[in-house]
């Protein structure tokens, strides 16, 4: 990263707040803001966090679920653990069938909430990055539909564009409440937005839009 990016990050309010309040990343505030608004995670929930490194969202989720709940975090990178017995970290590719099976074992079957702040490797070319983002969203949905309990919730990062609109159109059929939003802590220049799905109807499989 360049010196200009580093300087801008240090001036960023949420970056400084994360350091002060001991959050692992500024992204923690996105989940805090969205959960405060939509009440996605509650005490006792089983939460699956996909693309979780460095653990900013898992950190917030652990606080919300309390000792009665469970957070399972998955990423290709190592996720440093938390001093909590109800946290499980899995290092691996969540599209891998063996990793999916391990996720289900750690969850004990089902999840109440599936969250993902994952982003694809970016090329700088908007159309390509949009397609990569939608592919990642669909990979998240592949496992979310497999593990999400009826009445469960999802929160997934995505980049705006026409292919995402097609995905959202299908999601509206499978959740009683579905919308897209952008929290205050998202950078203004970012094309990111978040899919908020509440009250899952219980469909067993996601049918991919992009093949």
From Swiss-Prot:
Catalysed reaction equations from the record: uridine(2552) in 23S rRNA + S-adenosyl-L-methionine = 2'-O-methyluridine(2552) in 23S rRNA + S-adenosyl-L-homocysteine + H(+)
GO CC field: cytoplasm
Keywords: Cytoplasm, Methyltransferase, rRNA processing, S-adenosyl-L-methionine, Transferase
Residues in coiled coil: none
Class of enzymatic activity (EC top level): transferase
Major localization class: cytoplasm
Gene3D superfamilies: Vaccinia Virus protein VP39
Localization per Swiss-Prot or TrEMBL: Cytoplasm
Binding site for S-adenosyl-L-methionine: 55, 57, 75, 93, 117
GO MF annotations in UniProt: rRNA (uridine-2'-O-)-methyltransferase activity
Cited InterPro entries: RNA_methyltr_RlmE (IPR050082), RNA_MeTrfase_FtsJ_dom (IPR002877), rRNA-MeTfrase_E (IPR015507), rRNA_MeTrfase_gammaproteobac (IPR004512), SAM-dependent_MTases_sf (IPR029063)
Pfam families: FtsJ
Enzyme active site: 157
EC number: 2.1.1.166
Family assignment from sequence similarity: Belongs to the class I-like SAM-binding methyltransferase superfamily. RNA methyltransferase RlmE family.
Free-text function comment from the UniProt entry: Specifically methylates the uridine in position 2552 of 23S rRNA at the 2'-O position of the ribose in the fully assembled 50S ribosomal subunit.
Identification of the protein by name: Ribosomal RNA large subunit methyltransferase E
Lineage of origin: Archaea, Methanobacteriati, Methanobacteriota, Methanomada group, Methanobacteria
Record gene name: rlmE
């Amino acid at each position: 990263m360049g010196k200009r990016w580093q300087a801008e990050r240090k001036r960023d309010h949420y970056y400084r707040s994360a350091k002060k309040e001991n959050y692992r990343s500024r992204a923690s505030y996105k989940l805090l803001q969205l959960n405060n608004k939509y009440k996605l995670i509650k005490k006792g929930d089983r939460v699956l966090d996909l693309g979780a490194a460095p653990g900013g969202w898992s950190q917030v989720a652990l606080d919300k679920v309390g000792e009665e709940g469970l957070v399972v975090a998955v990423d290709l990178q190592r996720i440093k653990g938390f001093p909590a017995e109800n946290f499980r970290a899995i290092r691996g590719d969540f599209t891998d069938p063996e990793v999916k099976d391990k996720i289900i074992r750690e969850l004990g079957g089902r999840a109440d909430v599936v969250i993902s702040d994952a982003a694809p490797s970016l090329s700088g070319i908007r159309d390509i990055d949009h397609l990569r983002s939608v592919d990642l969203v669909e990979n998240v949905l592949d496992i979310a539909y497999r593990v999400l309990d009826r009445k469960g919730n999802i929160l997934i990062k995505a980049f705006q564009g026409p292919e995402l609109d097609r995905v959202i159109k299908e999601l509206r059929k499978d959740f009683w409440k579905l919308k897209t939003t952008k929290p205050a802590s998202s950078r203004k220049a970012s094309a990111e937005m978040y899919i908020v799905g509440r009250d899952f109807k219980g469909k067993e499989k996601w049918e991919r839009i992009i093949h």
